[in-house]
Curated annotation (Swiss-Prot):
ATP 2 binds at R707, D746, L748, E752, G777, V778, H779, S780, Q820, E832. Its cofactor is Mg(2+); Mn(2+). This is Carbamoyl phosphate synthase large chain. It comes from Lactobacillus acidophilus (strain ATCC 700396 / NCK56 / N2 / NCFM). Large subunit of the glutamine-dependent carbamoyl phosphate synthetase (CPSase). CPSase catalyzes the formation of carbamoyl phosphate from the ammonia moiety of glutamine, carbonate, and phosphate donated by ATP, constituting the first step of 2 biosynthetic pathways, one leading to arginine and/or urea and the other to pyrimidine nucleotides. One of its GO terms (cellular component) is cytoplasm. Mg(2+) 4 binds at E832, N834. Residues 547-929 are annotated as: Carbamoyl phosphate synthetic domain.
Length: 1062
């Protein structure tokens, strides 16, 4: 049926900030959906709280609201806009849950607003564990024995009845939040309690574990006329028991027989039809490897993480099709945009293999529990395409941007056989490298299968690569072996290590023998129909399908997988760089490895190469395309790190030169510039040995800030207060070498700020200065920030502007740069300069109206700021005040300390804007899920050195009606100052008492925890345990007093003070 004419205005609910379990894939799907609806002539109103995304650009929807995703906030917008319908199935679990919550308030019925796409009843039937189980039984589809419970007691009773192991699956959550595998009553009681608290409907499914089965996923589409089709079938490398978001995944499925495939396909289609889902949906199934028995795990009645992967794996734009189906169109009348000739009902066919590997944050969180299970822990993922499973997997491994560039891990190599076997049995993020090591040591396929339950086929792929490794080692400079190794995805540096040569020598040898990659097209139809997609992957095969167009081209290097410190903000900048190049008439070519993002949507750039971001892979594309040059400023540290290698091979780096980038990033060279310009900076020393670091710290005087050079996201950065802490830091973190010195800085406690600037070599434009709300010492990515600044005088802003201009011109910056300052006692100190786009670009672009990445790209390509209509210096400030607040994923990562310091820990951000600072703060806190009651109970656990600072904060809490709880030391101090305080006993004192601090938290007596015990970093220390308990109980937690001060400003604005007259 043709699209509906009875609706005109559609509201799309976005997915909010990036957290573990819900990352950039919803920026991609939401952007696609909004554009698809506008393409069909509908007016689109978008609500999302995340400023870092392309989705919240004003070009994506007719009206964009960056507001908190709360029922109150969205209800206000609905009453203002009066949409005819809401499309909730493209904003992840957040969008879906918000639609359900809005429906329950009655506002949708009251204003006669329809939910488009999958109907409410179907969503509830798929998401409510009990209803879904009953539906499967009616359809005759098998599900594991299970029971829906609302209490811990009911969970334990059922567990005892059916026996362990058991899986807990909370209702209406995503990323496996709150769930887990339980091997006994104690584990079940703990996990069920947590799951019930995190489920918005206080409900969990307790299910007999089927761990060890094959895990298969189908991405399915269905329209209003009951046409249904399979877009993609994916198979997990890891068996059931590890969350699919934490599993290595292959597409198409690798081990299913035709009978198994058809059986599971029929089941998926039967489910989507029975649920009457309209749009995209993800079906997860478990197949017994030894029979034809299978079980249905779950159905996601929405576009999901797997949909983004399936879209990129096949080229079939699922979210775009789902949006068109939602407005009444059918699969047989929507054109497939890839071929331009076939229709959307044709099932994609793949003549290649796709491999996805998750990207985990454990390089940041070394003390975290790395065990993988049913609760997702990865922050992002990479995808690679090859002609063989081996090639796809090797390309995916080197896309991860971790220490391991292939299947060799030094840590695995050094492990004893006992440790190796433990690592195989208990899956962690590095299991793949231990699998490879097992085969190097001669373990048989049977041995490894027995330990891991991973399918023999997948183990054989890993074993084959290790055999190939051995052949390479034994046949140095053998051309036929080299050709075969390249077909199986071996990189030049890996081969160089095996041959005892350099990567450049291998590259030259390979090219001399005509061993160069060709590029194949991703066309959805295995070349069955003519296709025009400019979407390519490399392989070592015969025919090349990518040809130079003859137009002037520029290559833009993306930012790779989403990880802490390098998030979706860099993808935003990449996409805007591409747009600017296209407007200037250049052919814009993107190289990236992340399937979740907008930049890897083939319709964004003129050509997309889905490749690892390594020197070899990028050079191969440069060899083919011969671009005017490469832009590296927008891909974070990933692309900056490639610049020197590319230039050494004759590739032109556009914008700031490699030499000048090095002058900004090399500490010694940068210090020379600061001295030459007579600028202030915290005193600092550089050391290349452990002894040198300790000597430097003692010379400067504690506290000091220590960090390695050349890092992003404050990795391995800490404030240390004495020699003992410094020695622990050196032991835990750091490999020091002459070319990787450690920087030791005097720690300045002042007000920090971020400046993004664009320079054309003559003029320097500062779109804005962002003032951090927390004092120096909290990483800029974890700080709340406000624009325009609230405490800086005009004189300070002028000083910041002058210093920025001096640095930009001295560093010969052409394009964009970011500078961090500390303001203290009216003086401005330079902390660091990043000669690239920073994570604040999307936020500042949206609130200033200056498209910073586009302006910078035009500058890079030779168009001056004046020619673009911009002046020199600080841009004028708007009337609106905007606050950026970080969002964390601590609830997904056991044992990660939530105390904030110089190493970045946040996974996403939200924005609040209003006409007053207090209201903007309130919206930012609400967006970050820190909505507090007007009066409640606050628990204060404070370091001795913060006692004086807590007094005014505690008094303000008391004035707005909060009860104050504290342990003895803090309580005595506050009582002496005339405050009423409820005493709680310490963590290890009288653990059974009701007033024990942990029991107060467990019993939901506390609404907010303020904990500044930063030295309590050991897992058994009071400060750490209190922070962990607050996270587990979902109680808002603050670890900086400046944040508490900001929160009070927001709360005071909502509350009425009650003061006596006398």
């Amino acid at each position: 049926m043709p699209k509906r004419k009875d609706i005109h205005k559609i509201m799309v609910i976005g997915s909010g900030p990036i957290i573990i379990g819900q990352a950039a894939e919803f920026d991609y799907s939401g952007t696609q959906a909004c554009l698809a609806l506008r393409e069909e002539g509908y007016q689109v109103v978008l609500v999302n709280s995340n400023p870092a995304t392309i989705m919240t650009d004003t070009t994506i929807a007719d009206k964009v609201y960056i507001e908190p995703l709360t029922v109150d906030s969205i209800s206000r917008i609905i009453r203002q806009e009066y949409p005819d319908a809401i499309l909730p199935t493209l904003g992840g679990q957040v969008g879906l849950n918000m639609a359900l919550a809005l429906a329950k308030t009655g506002i949708l019925d009251e204003l006669n607003i329809e939910l488009l796409g999958t109907k409410l009843k179907s969503i509830e039937q798929a998401e409510d564990r009990e209803q879904f189980k009953n539906l499967c039984k009616e359809l005759g589809e098998p599900v594991p024995p299970s029971k829906t419970v609302n209490t811990v007691e009911a969970a334990v009773e059922f567990g005892d009845e059916i026996g362990y192991p058991i899986i807990v699956r909370p209702a209406f959550t995503m990323g496996g939040t709150g769930g887990g595998i339980c091997h006994n009553r104690k584990e079940l009681a703990e996990i069920a309690k947590n799951g019930l608290e995190l489920s918005p409907v206080t409900e969990c499914l307790i299910e007999k574990s089927i761990a060890g089965y094959k895990e298969i996923e189908f991405e399915v589409m269905r329209d209003h006329d009951d046409n249904a089709m399979i877009v993609c079938c994916m198979e997990n490398f890891d068996p059931v028991g590890i969350h699919t978001g934490d599993s290595i995944v292959f597409s198409p499925s690798q081990t299913l027989s035709d009978k198994e495939y058809q059986m599971l396909r029929d089941c998926s289609l039967k489910l989507i039809r029975a649920l009457k889902i309209e749009g995209g949906c993800n079906v997860q199934l478990a197949l017994d490897p030894n029979s034809f028995d299978y079980d249905v795990i779950e159905v996601n009645p929405r576009v999901s993480r797997s949909s983004a992967l399936a879209s990129k794996a096949t080229g079939y734009p699922i979210a775009k099709m789902a949006a068109k189906i939602a407005v009444g169109m059918t699969l047989d009348e929507i054109k497939n945009p890839v071929t331009g000739t076939t229709y959307a009902e044709f099932e994609p066919a793949l003549d290649y293999v796709v491999c996805k590997i998750p990207r985990w944050p454990f390089d940041k969180f070394q003390k975290a529990d790395r065990t993988l299970g049913t609760q997702m822990k990865a922050t992002g993922e990479v995808m690679a395409i090859g002609r063989t499973a081996e090639e796809a997997m090797q390309k995916a491994v080197r896309s991860l941007e971790i220490d391991e560039k292939d299947l060799y891990s030094e840590e695995a190599h050094r492990a004893s056989d006992d440790k190796l076997e433990q690592k195989l049995v208990k899956a962690q993020d590095d299991r793949l490298f231990y699998l490879a090591e097992a085969f190097r040591r001669g373990y048989s396929l049977e041995d490894v299968h027995e330990l891991t339950k991973i399918n023999f086929y997948f183990l054989d792929i890993v074993k084959h690569m290790i055999e190939m490794e051995k052949e390479l080692k034994e046949n140095k400079d053998e051309v036929d072996i080299l050709r075969l190794a390249k077909k199986y995805g071996f990189s030049d540096p890996t081969i160089a290590n095996l041959w005892g040569e350099t990567a450049d020598e291998v590259r030259d040898f390979r090219k001399a023998h005509g061993i160069i990659p060709v590029y194949k097209m991703v066309d959805t139809c295995a070349a069955e129909f003519e296709s025009q997609t400019p979407y390519f992957y490399s392989t070592y095969d015969a025919e090349n399908e990518s040809h130079r167009s003859g137009k002037k081209s520029v290559i833009v290097i993306g930012s790779g997988p989403i990880r802490i410190g390098q998030g979706v903000e860099f993808d935003y900048a990449t996409v805007h760089c591409v747009k600017a190049l296209q407007k200037m008439g250049y052919e814009a070519i993107v190289i990236n490895s992340n399937p979740e993002t907008v930049s890897t949507d083939f319709s964004v750039s003129d050509k997309l190469y889905f490749e690892p971001l390594t020197l070899e892979d990028v050079l191969n594309v440069c060899d083919l395309e011969e671009p005017e040059g490469v832009i590296v400023q927008f891909g974070g540290q990933t692309s900056i790190n490639l610049a020197a290698g590319l230039e050494a091979h004759g590739v032109k780096i556009l914008g700031t030169t490699v030499k000048d980038v090095n002058r900004a990033e090399d500490r010694k060279l940068f210090d020379d510039i600061i001295k030459e310009l007579k600028l202030n900076q915290p005193q600092g020393l550089t050391a290349t040995t452990h002894e040198g670091v300790i000597e430097a710290a003692e010379k400067l005087g504690y506290p000091v800030l220590v960090r390695p050079s050349y890092v992003l996201g404050g990795k391995a950065m800490e404030i240390v207060y004495n020699k003992k802490e410094l020695e622990e830091y050196l032991q835990d973190h750091v490999d020091i070498a002459a070319d990787h010195p450690i920087l030791v800085d005097d720690y300045l406690d002042g007000r920090e700020c971020d400046v993004d600037a664009i320079s054309d070599g003559y003029d320097v434009l500062l779109p804005g200065i962002m003032e951090h709300i927390e004092h120096a010492g909290v990483h800029s990515g974890d700080s709340m920030a406000v624009y325009p600044p609230q405490t800086f005088t005009d004189e300070i802003k002028e000083k910041i502007t002058e210093v920025t201009k001096k640095l930009a011109l001295t560093l010969n910056c052409v394009g964009i740069m970011n500078i961090q300052f500390i303001v203290r006692d009216g003086e401005v100190y330079v902390i660091e300069v990043n000669p690239r786009a920073s994570r604040t670009v999307p936020f500042l672009s949206k609130i200033t109206g200056i498209e910073m990445a586009q302006v910078a790209t035009r500058v890079i390509m030779g168009e001056s700021l004046k020619e673009q209509g911009y002046g020199d210096g600080l841009a004028s400030e708007p009337d609106m005040i905007s606050v950026k607040a970080p969002v964390f994923s601590f609830s997904k990562l056991a044992d990660v300390d939530s105390y904030l310091g110089p190493e970045m820990k946040s996974t996403g951000e939200v924005m609040g804007s209003d006409h007053t600072f207090a209201k903007a703060l309130y919206k930012a806190f609400a967006g970050a899920k820190m909505q507090l009651p007007e009066n409640g109970n606050v628990l204060l656990t404070i370091e001795d050195r913060d006692k004086d600072k807590i007094l005014p904060i505690a008094k303000r809490f008391a004035r707005i009606g909060y009860r104050i709880f504290a342990t003895k030391g803090t309580a005595d101090f506050l009582k002496k100052n005339d405050l009423h305080v409820d005493l709680v006993t310490k963590v290890h004192e009288d653990e059974q008492a009701d007033d024990n601090i942990l029991n107060e938290l467990r019993n939901n007596k506390i609404d907010l925890v303020i904990n500044t015990m930063g030295h309590d970093i050991e897992k058994n220390s009071d400060g750490f345990i209190i922070r962990q308990m607050a996270i587990q109980q979902n109680v808002p937690l603050l670890t900086a007093l400046d944040t508490a001060d900001a929160l009070l400003t927001a709360l005071e604005n909502r509350s009425f003070a009650t003061d006596a007259l006398q």
